[in-house]
Amino acid sequence: MTTTTSDLTVLRAGTLDYEAAWEEQRRLHESVVTDKHGDAVLLLEHPSVYTAGKRTEPWDRPMDGTPVIDVDRGGKITWHGPGQLVGYPILRLPDPVDVVAYVRRVEQMLIDVCAEFGLVAGRIEGRSGVWVPADDRGPARKVAAIGIRVARGVTLHGFSLNCDCDLTYYDRIVPCGIRDAGVTSLAAELGRPVTVADALPVVERHLPTLVGA
């Protein structure tokens, strides 16, 4: 399904292998760079896969030989899979390119999405992503991860929002290289089902906040 506004095309790709999604990202990126296509966002789920960003250390990886795909985004290792909504914004950033400001816009968009579901989430100084603050249930917990790259002024990679995924997949790795915090999902925090299908229209409604600022 494709939704287009005057500024942004949103492509719902269903479930897509990581390599196929990466190929589509690169195709869209080239089209945006060469002005053949306007800003676009891919929204999808992946089959279970681990991906390692450029700052991943050997000890962050699974110890049991689980396959890992090395990618050219920032950040460290993470997991993608069923029950997690992944977004790949392919956006031309205004000059001068401010990567930190873009990451903050992505974070705020996801914070606003969480708020619509009734979950209070925010930022932690020095750490990217969106977090549920420490409370009597435990330390701070990441509900959404962000890892991006900017090439020729246009973004690649993006964000992942844990909806109702199996959180035990994170037990094999040091997610995003952070040992002193946890990982969570909308469903785990709210105590009710929140599926990718539930999250899709909410995320889609907030995506225009990423464009043109």
Curated annotation (Swiss-Prot):
Signal peptide: none annotated. Pfam families: LplA-B_cat (PF21948). Disulfide bonds: none annotated. It is found in: Cytoplasm. The keyword Transferase applies. The active site is at C176 (acyl-thioester intermediate). GO terms for molecular function: lipoyl(octanoyl) transferase activity. Its EC number is 2.3.1.181. GO terms for biological process: protein modification process. The keyword Phosphoprotein does not apply. The record marks K142 as: Lowers pKa of active site Cys. GO terms for cellular component: cytoplasm. Keywords: Acyltransferase, Cytoplasm, Transferase. CDD domains: LipB (cd16444). Pathway: Protein modification; protein lipoylation via endogenous pathway; protein N(6)-(lipoyl)lysine from octanoyl-[acyl-carrier-protein]: step 1/2. Residues 35-213 form the BPL/LPL catalytic domain. It comes from the Bacteria. PANTHER family: LIPOYLTRANSFERASE 2, MITOCHONDRIAL-RELATED (PTHR10993:SF7), OCTANOYLTRANSFERASE (PTHR10993). Belongs to the LipB family. This is Octanoyltransferase. It comes from Salinispora arenicola (strain CNS-205).
